[in-house]
A protein has these predicted regions:
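Short, compositionally biased segments
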Residues: 202-215, 220-258, 355-363
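Conserved catalytic cores and adjacent C-terminal regulatory segments
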Residues: 3-146, 152-158, 162-181, 186-192, ...
Length: 701
C-alpha cells in the first residue's frame, strides 16, 4: 500500500493539470505563490514568471491591480525552455491589451492561443483575429503598438498586415475601425502580391465596397477591380448582380468596359436594379460613359427600362444633351416616345433643350412608295416572296437593323414573312440564322461582341474564332435539310477549277442534275449548316478557303438574280405555276463615291513615275475588287429589269442606305460602326412609308 500526504496529493493534481492543458488560462489565488518553494524568475511590467520547486513547474501570471487576491495564470509548464520562450512572447504581446482595458480569464484565453499559434503576429493582428476590435480605437493601444514588432502595419509570416487579415475574414467592423482610427497603409502587398482589397474580394462584397469607397488602392482601383472580378467570377460566383451595380458606380474609366464585360460573360443580370430603381445602364448614362453603356446594350440591356421616376436611359441622355449616348441608345432601339412619370418623352426633352439633341432624333418623312400597293396586292395573291441579303462582312449589322425595323412594322418574325431567303457571305450567315429562328436583336449583339475575336490580328485571320461562332449558333451536327421552310439559298464559289463556278447551298433538292466531272458535291441532306455558312464567308485575304470553296461575294455579292434564276428553275422542274410575286433585296450600305486620279502604269525607273505606277496599281486593284463585289450598281439595275419583265414587285433602292464614309469589311471600331448604324436608322425612318407598305404586303400575303 502506498500512502500520499496532502502535499503529495496536491502536487499530483497540479502535474495532472499541467499534462492535460498547461496553457489553459484560469484564475488562481495569489497566496499560492507566497512562501517557500516559489521563486520569482522574471518580471516584465505585469507579467511574472514563477518557478515552483515542489512540483517542478514554471507558472506565468498576469498581475491585475483591480483583483489583489486573484490573478490569471497564463500557463503552467514543466519545461523551462517553453516557459522562457512563451513568457517573452506574452510579456510583449499582452501589454497593449492590459494597458487598454481590464482583462478576464475568458478574454485572455483566445489572445494567448493566437500568440502561440502565430508567434510572429503583432498585437494588432491578434486583435483582429480574436475579434477584439474595440482595442483598436484606444489611443493607448495605438501608442503601444507603435514599436516595430507590434506596428499597426507590420506583416506576418506571409506578408499580411492586420488590414489584410480583417479583409480576409470579412470583418467589416474591424476594417472600418482600422481605416478610421488607425494609420494603416492600404498599399502593402503580401508575399503573394495580394493587397487588402484582394482579400476583401475573395470573401465579402461589402468589405470590398467599403475599401474602395474609403480609398484603398485608389490609384490603381481600375486594375485592382478587374483582377478582383476575375477571382470573384471564377471562384466565388455569387452576388454578381450587385457587383455590376457597384462597378458602374465606382470604377474609373480605363478598365470599366472590361469589368462590365467580364461580369456579363459570367451570367450577371444586365438589367438588375439598385434601391432607387436604376439599372447599370441608367448609372453609366448619368456618368456619360457611352462605351461602357454600349457593352451593356450588346449584352442585352433593356434600353427602355424605367427607374423610379419613370425615366429611361434615353431620358437621362437627352437631359444631359450627350450626343454619343443618344446615338448609342437609339441605335439599340430606345423608344423616343416613352413618357416618364411627369409625362415627358425623350423627344419632348430634346425639343426643350434645343442644344442639338433634337436634330439627332429620327424623324419620319411622309414619303410614298414608288408603286401603288393596292394595285399590286390584287395581282400578287398566292405568289412567293423572296428576301435577298447582300454580302459585306461586319456591315451585316446594316442588314440586321433593316430586318429588325421590318419585323417591328410587320409584327411577325422575318422567317414567317418570306417563302425564300437568299444570302451571300454575311448575308448568307444571316439567312441561315433567320430560317433557324434566331432573334435579330441577339444577332446584332453577337456581331458587336464577336468582331474583335473574328477580326483579331492581321489579315488573313485565323479561322478558329469564326468557326467556333458558327458551330455555337447552328450546332456542329445540324444539316441543311433539318429546317425546310422557308427555303434558303447560300451562295459560294467553287474554286477548284477555272473558270470558277457559283455554288448554292440549299435546304431542298436542287432543281437540276449535274454532269460535273470534278469531285462530287455534298447533297443537302448531308451538308452541315455551319460549313455552308463558313464556305459562303471565306473571303480571300480575310479567311482561309473552306476546302474548295471561296466567298460567294466573288460572283454573287448581290444574290438577287441568281436566286430568281434558281427559283425559276425549281418551279420549272416541278411544273409549278406558282410565280415569284415579290423580291425584297437588302444591301449593306452604299459607299460614297470617291475620285480616282491615276490609272496609268509606266515602264520607267523614274522615281516620280514609279510612285504614280504604284498608286495606279493600287487604284486598279480596288476597282477590280469593286467590280467583283458590286451589289448596288449594275446588279440592281439588272434585277429591277428582270422583275419588270416577269411582273414581279421589286423593292431595292430605298433599303440600301447611303453611308457617309467607306466602312471596311473587317471594321472593329465601335465609333465607326455606331455611326454606320445611326445613318441606317435615320435612313429607315426617312423611308418609313415604304417600309410600312412592304410590311403590310408581307403581313397580308
Amino acid at each position: 500500500t502506498v500512502f500520499f500526504n496532502r502535499g503529495h496529493l496536491k502536487c499530483f493534481n497540479l502535474l495532472d493539470t499541467v499534462s492535460n492543458n498547461p496553457y489553459r488560462v484560469r484564475d488562481v489565488p495569489l497566496s499560492d505563490y507566497a512562501g517557500g518553494g516559489k521563486v520569482k524568475l522574471r518580471e516584465e511590467n505585469r507579467v511574472v514568471l514563477y518557478k515552483k520547486s515542489q512540483c517542478q513547474s514554471w507558472d506565468c501570471l498576469l498581475m491585475c491591480p483591480n483583483t489583489p487576491t486573484m490573478t490569471p495564470r497564463l500557463f503552467q509548464v514543466v519545461s523551462e525552455d517553453d516557459a522562457m520562450n512563451w513568457f517573452s512572447q506574452y510579456a510583449l504581446k499582452l501589454q497593449p491589451f492590459y494597458d487598454t482595458l481590464p482583462l478576464k480569464a475568458e478574454s485572455i484565453q483566445p489572445i494567448v492561443n493566437c500568440i502561440r499559434s502565430h508567434p510572429d503576429w503583432s498585437c494588432a493582428h491578434i486583435a483582429v483575429k480574436t475579434g477584439l476590435r474595440k482595442f483598436l480605437k484606444y489611443t493607448s493601444f495605438q501608442r503601444t503598438v507603435s514599436c516595430a514588432s507590434n506596428h499597426i502595419n507590420s506583416q506576418n509570416e506571409v506578408g499580411q498586415t492586420p488590414l489584410h487579415l480583417a479583409c480576409e475574414r470579412g470583418d467589416l467592423a474591424s476594417v472600418k475601425q482600422l481605416l478610421d482610427e488607425s494609420q494603416v497603409r492600404t498599399d502593402i502587398s503580401d508575399f503573394y502580391g495580394d493587397t487588402p482589397m484582394h482579400c476583401a474580394c475573395k470573401h465579402r462584397f461589402s468589405v470590398f465596397a467599403l475599401c474602395s469607397q474609403l480609398g484603398i488602392g485608389v490609384n490603381d482601383l481600375n486594375i485592382v477591380i478587374l483582377l478582383f472580378l476575375e477571382y470573384f467570377c471564377f471562384e466565388a460566383h455569387k452576388q454578381l448582380d450587385m457587383w455590376l451595380i457597384f462597378v458602374s458606380q465606382v470604377a474609373v474609366l480605363r478598365f470599366l468596359c472590361q469589368m462590365c464585360r467580364l461580369l456579363l460573360e459570367h451570367d450577371c443580370s444586365v438589367n438588375v436594379l439598385n434601391k432607387t430603381g436604376q439599372s447599370p445602364l441608367h448609372i453609366l448614362t448619368k456618368q456619360g460613359r457611352s462605351k461602357a453603356a454600349l457593352v451593356l446594350l450588346t449584352h442585352g440591356a433593356d434600353a427602355n427600362l424605367k427607374d423610379q421616376d419613370g425615366n429611361t436611359a434615353l431620358h437621362l441622355a437627352m437631359k444631359m444633351n450627350h450626343m454619343d449616348l443618344i446615338k448609342v441608345l437609339i441605335v439599340f432601339w430606345a423608344d423616343v416616345e416613352i413618357p416618364n412619370n411627369l409625362g415627358e418623352t425623350p423627344g419632348l426633352i430634346a425639343a426643350q433643350t434645343s442644344k442639338g439633341a433634337r436634330r439627332l432624333l429620327p424623324v419620319s418623312r411622309p414619303l410614298v412608295p414608288s408603286w401603288d400597293l393596292a394595285v399590286v396586292l390584287e395581282g400578287l395573291k398566292q405568289m412567293d416572296k423572296l428576301l435577298c441579303l447582300d454580302g459585306g462582312g461586319i456591315k451585316g449589322l446594316v442588314l440586321i437593323q433593316m430586318l429588325i425595323a421590318l419585323e417591328q412594322e410587320a409584327g411577325q418574325p422575318i422567317r414567317e414573312l418570306f417563302d425564300w431567303v437568299a444570302g451571300t457571305s454575311t448575308g448568307g450567315i444571316l439567312a441561315l440564322c433567320i430560317i433557324h429562328g434566331k432573334r435579330l436583336k441577339d444577332l446584332q449583339n453577337l456581331y458587336f461582341n464577336m468582331k474583335e475575336q473574328v477580326f483579331e490580328g492581321w489579315r488573313p485571320y485565323t479561322k478558329k474564332p469564326l468557326e467556333k461562332f458558327l458551330k455555337k449558333e447552328f450546332g456542329e451536327d445540324t444539316k441543311m435539310t433539318d429546317v425546310s421552310h422557308p427555303r434558303v439559298m447560300v451562295t459560294s464559289v467553287l474554286a477548284d477549277r477555272r473558270p470558277c463556278k457559283l455554288h448554292i447551298f440549299r435546304n431542298y433538292e436542287p432543281p437540276y442534275s449535274t454532269s460535273d466531272t470534278f469531285r462530287p458535291l455534298t447533297i443537302p441532306q448531308d451538308q452541315l449548316v455551319w460549313k455552308a455558312a463558313r464556305a459562303s464567308s471565306a473571303a480571300p485575304t480575310y479567311f482561309p478557303p473552306m476546302g474548295r470553296f471561296l466567298d460567294g461575294g466573288l460572283l454573287a455579292n448581290n444574290p438577287t438574280l441568281d436566286a430568281m434564276a434558281e427559283i425559276h428553275q425549281y418551279n420549272k422542274a416541278l411544273n409549278d405555276t406558282k410565280k415569284l410575286g415579290m423580291v425584297l433585296s437588302l444591301g449593306t450600305g452604299k459607299s460614297p463615291e470617291v475620285e480616282v486620279t491615276s490609272l496609268e502604269l509606266f515602264k520607267s525607273c523614274n522615281p516620280v513615275k514609279l510612285a504614280k505606277s504604284l498608286k495606279a496599281a493600287n487604284n486598279l486593284l480596288k476597282i477590280l475588287m469593286d467590280c467583283c463585289t458590286d451589289s448596288d450598281g449594275c446588279a440592281v439595275d439588272r434585277a429591277r429589269a428582270f422583275c419588270e419583265m416577269t411582273d414581279t414587285l421589286y423593292q431595292r433602292c430605298v433599303l440600301s442606305p447611303q453611308l457617309s464614309v467607306e466602312v471596311m469589311l473587317n471594321e472593329v471600331d465601335d465609333g465607326v460602326l455606331l455611326n454606320m448604324l445611326w445613318e441606317t436608322r435615320t435612313y429607315l425612318n426617312e423611308q418609313r412609308a415604304v417600309l410600312q407598305s412592304v410590311a403590310q404586303f408581307l403581313r397580308d400575303h
